[in-house]
């Protein structure tokens, strides 16, 4: 009867040999986690389970210890550190039972890589488990090899490398295959092992078992991604395997391997390419065909003039793009893009296929197809492609599945990518594919409208740049473009949502303000709204107002009183901008404010009807000194590197300075204020010629012969210069009414702001005429625009949230030509360091225990009664602690040597 009242722990201990456990298993842990209702309850539950595992893992029973290690391994995935239990994991690894050993290796693969010291203790255990014997079955060796691959370090790889090479000669194909795959991680950490045992490893390519050959080819393929140089010598063997092997998996791995090798050895192309093309035609396996094309493209085997190989690849990809498998269609689009980058003529005839892919049910395929447009767009199909893309902003695509219709949701990132793609294909090659620029101007306006609801901030900048480029590069349509710009500036939605577009539009208004009729009203509009704009926009607004103000003041008929009133209206908002938080706005507003105040004082002092020189001569000289020319983005930054500034030579000598001060004539180089942007192209300042009749300086009348000579010389200078318009072109530029150009637009209440001076308002049906587009200027010979970097933000998504799975290895930078040095490594050094570390740790523990015992004895000496018993108690408490430590250490060491 006494057994009925035995302690609970004793009953559990007796029942465990029969397979009856009362501790919580991994299944109970998972059920408990799923039953928690809140994060707080889950955290409390996990903390309680972790404390239970800390007690269970110290138990002498290996079943309980294994169960605790298994639960700790699961909790490690929740972020709980289990490195404190590494010694207990090592004990479980040393168990003779396969189930317990497997749990130990699983836990070791998750925690041992953080602690190199414990791996040094586990080296002998690994070597013992890797040796085949009657007591050590094949599956046990497989578990050890799998665990080794997950926790290998440079030191462990060095110690275990020879044992793995011995396993390559095992009679069991399973062992040879597992050993080959384990060598992959070993070679990454210890490339000397590959260098010293290269022949032994390569011999597995001729193994009798196909699985071993497949594993060897796979390992070589993965190693070649890091350092392909040592495997080039294997090309003849691999080539013969590619011809003879029938296994598709091995063929795919061989093709991937040749892809890596051909990138550094161009001579392989001549030998490999014909066989790959033959394999691509003979096989029916889609995976092999795709990998063959990928090998040709990524292995640099396809030259830009090899049309036969390109056609063979593209025909196969065309069939893949019509497949029902969306994954195959996407991968085919990727290869289409890579082939198009080699030579765009290769994919020029696949416009029908690309049009079909642009409306694919899979949006990811549509997104990838957008990258193909650059290679197939011509002036004949540009409009079709753009219209197909614009319809996706308006129409709702539907798909029918099981007689049910589902609408295709177009994500925002794809809409942004469509707008970027439209801007790219229309502007490429200096707008060579655009035949109707009026259509293109209307297209940019539509894109501005559909971009208002998108969050991509780069769209506004991109569209604004396109509008600005049209104004600069297409002078024949500046009036039409300016009419569209006026509508965009008036739009409140553009002002609020697309400040990047508004910035470029305001710049165009200022730069080409001579085409505007009612300039004073534009000045007032921009000045009044200056407070509503962002600082980046205000930086452009201030000089734009001055440009419009300059052209307006120098018109033929302007009331002086009106000029004074408008000047005062400009000064008021500028006084508010000088206290802006943006330094650039402060500087520009201060400069403009001081100059306008001087102009206002000059207007007040001068009682005559003529304007002061500040308005007629000085202000126009700020902006009309040079003809604006388009240059490639980034050229100015590249140009600064080639300019040398001489800071030693004086700018003017004393005699030249005295002569300059004594000269009372007008300053050379000032452009007449009466000349507009287009008129300035046909009139040029001539030294010695009299300026306009604005001042009182003496004039010299030129004879007819002199004028003809000057005109002839000017024509000769402008021959071949694309940045000057011919006289016929200048005369053909008409200033038409913007309201007439925008006849299809809705009438606005502020229609007076959009009038242009018109010479003829007759409406005629316009024909599509190829207009002249100004090319980018070459500022300095020798500046390579290909080397110019662009610092503007890219619309490529950032990769900061991606998980970096690339592990550190020594194979990438290892030099296989370096001979082996026998004195590189002394195996006793690391062992001696470990012994010294443990000895130092033991001394620290003993000193801490001794100090604690002395303190207790001193305290107990003060009391006379019970001093001996107290000393005995203190010593009895201190001694078991040391014995317990020795016992734990003694228990660990036998566990490491248990058979």
From Swiss-Prot:
GO terms (BP aspect): Golgi to vacuole transport; protein targeting to vacuole
UniProt biased composition (Basic residues): 857-880
Any coiled-coil regions, as ranges: 841-862
Ranges for the HEAT repeats: 37-74, 155-192, 194-229, 231-267, 268-305, 308-344, 345-382, 384-428, 480-518, 536-580, 590-613, 614-656
Matches recorded under InterPro entries: AP3_complex_dsu (IPR017105), ARM-like (IPR011989), ARM-type_fold (IPR016024), Clathrin/coatomer_adapt-like_N (IPR002553)
Predominant location category: Golgi
Its job: Part of the AP-3 complex, an adaptor-related complex which is not clathrin-associated. The complex is associated with the Golgi region as well as more peripheral structures. It facilitates the budding of vesicles from the Golgi membrane and may be directly involved in trafficking to the vacuole.
Quaternary structure annotation from Swiss-Prot or TrEMBL: Adaptor protein complex 3 (AP-3) is a heterotetramer composed of 2 large adaptins (APL5 and APL6), a medium adaptin (APM3) and a small adaptin (APS3).
Name of the protein this chain belongs to: AP-3 complex subunit delta
Gene designation: APL5
């Amino acid at each position: 009867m006494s057994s009925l009242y035995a302690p609970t722990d004793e009953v559990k201990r007796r029942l465990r040999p029969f397979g009856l456990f009362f501790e919580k298993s991994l299944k109970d842990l998972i059920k408990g986690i799923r039953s928690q209702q809140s994060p707080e309850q889950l955290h409390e539950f996990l903390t309680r389970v972790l404390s239970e595992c800390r007690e269970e893992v110290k138990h002498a029973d290996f079943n309980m210890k294994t169960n605790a290690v298994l639960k700790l391994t699961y909790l490690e995935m929740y972020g709980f550190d289990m490195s404190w239990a590494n010694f207990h994991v090592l004990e479980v690894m040393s168990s003779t039972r396969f189930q317990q050993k497997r749990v130990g290796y699983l836990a070791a693969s998750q925690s041992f890589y953080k602690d190199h010291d414990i791996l040094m203790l586990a080296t002998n255990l690994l070597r013992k488990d890797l040796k085949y014997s009657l007591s050590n079955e094949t599956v046990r060796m497989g578990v050890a090899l799998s665990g080794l691959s997950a926790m290998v370090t440079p030191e462990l790889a060095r110690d275990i490398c020879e044992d793995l090479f011995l396993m390559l000669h095992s009679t069991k194909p399973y062992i040879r295959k597992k050993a080959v795959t384990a060598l992959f991680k070993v070679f990454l950490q210890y490339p000397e092992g590959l260098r010293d045992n290269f022949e032994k490893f390569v011999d597995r390519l001729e193994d009798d078992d196909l699985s071993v050959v497949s594993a060897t080819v796979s390992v070589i393929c993965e190693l070649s991604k890091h350092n392909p140089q040592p495997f080039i010598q294997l090309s003849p063997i691999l080539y013969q395997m590619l011809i003879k092997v029938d296994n598709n998996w091995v063929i795919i791995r061989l093709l991937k391997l040749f892809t890596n090798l051909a990138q550094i050895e161009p001579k392989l192309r001549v030998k490999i390419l014909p066989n790959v093309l033959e394999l691509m035609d003979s096989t029916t396996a889609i995976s092999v065909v795709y990998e063959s094309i990928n090998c040709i493209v990524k292995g640099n085997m396809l030259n830009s003039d090899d049309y036969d190989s390109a056609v063979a690849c593209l025909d196969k990809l065309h069939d893949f793009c019509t497949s029902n498998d969306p994954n195959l269609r996407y991968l085919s689009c990727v290869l289409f893009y890579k082939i198009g980058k080699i030579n765009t003529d290769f994919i020029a005839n696949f416009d029908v296929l690309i049009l079909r892919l642009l409306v694919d049910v899979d949006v990811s395929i549509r997104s990838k197809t957008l990258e193909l447009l650059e290679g197939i767009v011509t002036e004949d199909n540009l409009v079709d492609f753009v219209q197909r893309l614009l319809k996706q902003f308006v129409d709702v695509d539907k798909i029918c599945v099981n007689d049910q219709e589902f609408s295709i949701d177009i994500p925002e990132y794809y809409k942004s990518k469509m707008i970027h793609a439209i801007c790219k294909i229309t502007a490429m090659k200096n707008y060579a594919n655009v035949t109707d620029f009026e259509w293109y101007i209307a297209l940019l306006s539509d894109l501005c409208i559909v971009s208002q609801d998108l969050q991509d901030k780069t769209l506004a900048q991109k569209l604004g740049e396109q509008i600005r480029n049209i104004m600069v590069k297409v002078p024949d349509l500046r009036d039409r473009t300016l009419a569209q710009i006026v509508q965009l500036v008036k739009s409140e939605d553009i002002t609020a949502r697309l400040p990047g577009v508004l910035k470029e539009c305001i710049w165009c208004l200022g730069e080409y303000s001579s085409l505007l009729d009612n300039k004073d009203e534009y000045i007032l509009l921009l000045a009044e709204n200056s407070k509503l704009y962002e600082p980046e926009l205000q930086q452009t607004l201030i000089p734009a107002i001055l440009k419009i103000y300059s052209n307006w003041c120098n018109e033929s008929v302007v009331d002086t009183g009106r000029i004074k009133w408008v000047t005062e209206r400009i000064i008021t908002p500028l006084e508010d901008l000088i206290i802006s938080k943006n330094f650039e706005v402060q500087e520009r507003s201060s400069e403009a404010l001081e100059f306008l105040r001087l102009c206002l004082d000059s207007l007040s002092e001068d009682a005559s009807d003529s304007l002061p020189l500040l308005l007629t001569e000085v202000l126009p000289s700020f902006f009309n000194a040079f003809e604006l020319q388009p240059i490639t983005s980034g050229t100015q930054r590249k140009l600064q590197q080639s300019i040398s500034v001489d800071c030693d030579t004086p700018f003017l000598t004393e005699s030249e300075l005295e002569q300059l001060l004594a000269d009372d004539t007008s300053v050379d180089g000032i452009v007449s204020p009466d000349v507009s942007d287009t008129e300035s192209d046909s009139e040029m300042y001539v030294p010695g010629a009299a300026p306009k009749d604005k001042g009182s300086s003496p004039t010299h009348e030129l004879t007819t012969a002199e004028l003809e000579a000057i005109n002839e010389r000017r024509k000769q200078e402008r021959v071949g210069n694309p940045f000057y318009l011919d006289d016929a072109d200048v005369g053909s530029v008409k200033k038409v009414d913007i309201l007439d150009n925008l006849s299809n637009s809705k009438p606005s209440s502020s229609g007076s702001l959009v009038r242009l001076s018109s010479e003829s308002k007759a409406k005629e049906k316009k024909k599509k005429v190829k207009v002249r587009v100004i090319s980018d200027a070459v500022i300095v010979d020798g500046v390579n625009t290909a080397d110019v970097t662009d610092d503007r933000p890219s619309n490529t998504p950032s990769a900061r949230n991606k998980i970096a799975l690339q592990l550190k290895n020594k194979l990438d930078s290892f030099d296989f030509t370096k001979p082996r040095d026998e004195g590189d490594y002394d195996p006793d050094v690391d062992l001696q360091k470990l012994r010294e570390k443990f000895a130092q740790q033991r001394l620290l523990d003993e000193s801490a225990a001794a100090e604690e015992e002395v303190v207790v004895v001193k305290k107990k000496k003060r009391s006379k009664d019970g001093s001996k018993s107290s000393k005995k108690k203190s010593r009895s408490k201190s001694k078991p602690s040391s014995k317990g430590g020795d016992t734990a250490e003694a228990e660990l060491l036998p566990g490491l040597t248990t058979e």
